[in-house]
Amino acid sequence: CRGFLWKGRRDVQGGHCLVAWDQVCTPKEIGGLGIPNLRLLNAALRARWPWLERTDPHRPWNEFNLQVSCESLGIYRAATHCVLGDGESARFWTDWWLWDGRIEELMPNLYAFVRKPARLKTVRQAMVEGWWQDISPDMTTRALLEFIALVDRMQDVDLTPGTEDRIHWAWDSTGQFSAKSAYMACFAGRIEANGATQIWRSRAPATCKVFAWLAARNRCWTADRLQRRHLPHPSACPFCDQAQETIDHLLLGCVFARQVWSCITNAWGKPSWMPTAHATLGQWWTALTPQRQLRKEIWTVVTLVAWTIWRHRNDIVFNGASPSAEVVLRRIDEEGQDWRAAGLLREHGSLPRRVVRLDSGE
């Protein structure tokens, strides 16, 4: 899969891969391509087994005692808690039925002295038979302090006869297990990538979206990245011949790119959207505030402009073309009409019918 993505063949070398595979296999919102991470997806799917074992114990396969990996079991345990009823199914020591966690986690020193056969007792069994009788007598001082704390907590526990215990899945609004919520929880805590929403919710073709994704991650083969790898590279930006070529300079900060963006933002009637000389693509793109009904239209045009500037750069570097803002604007206009004909840009709306008004011809 990695070889097909980067080179269209089975085998590739590390230098062909512009982004590490574990980063590619993350959700688009946090900077990946949304390709499933099979290891995490497998763990998320297998978390369904302990869920069904507790919520539907009459399934035929339950008697086979299927082994669940620690990773899947960890997902299940992190996502579930018990709503206590009659205490017939909630496990006293290992289930999350107290308001703030599991006894085994809240009181690990005490739990270490609980006899193993008793660790699977239900809340009702533990309360009727005396949960303190399941603890070895030679407790440490810390375990004894936790024992006293548990005695105090148990004073407020009341069972509700006739009401079954209920296991709740915290990561889904329905309270029921879903593989998607289990999988997405594996990425919880990661920061949303700048520009991710704008890139992937635009209507641009997939090729252009992937380019914008690489550009936002600074993974295009510009001179700065080639230089770090001691590879042949242009000595300066092929547009202005004044600064080192970086992807942000090339697409936004260069005087050439700013000339193009000036025409675009003026055509929109939004000159304040003009990128600064030191802007980064993801941050600048995220900071744009179009009206809700125009967001996808604006995001699509931004992708088109960046894609066209990049192609013109490649014409200069590889084909010996001369820098020309007029050529870039004309190509934006021509390709924009093709995108409009394909339904990627609206025919009617607040944007001009042509993607950009050329300064020199119209």
Locate predicted features:
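A helix-boundary/hinge signal
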Residues: 1-362
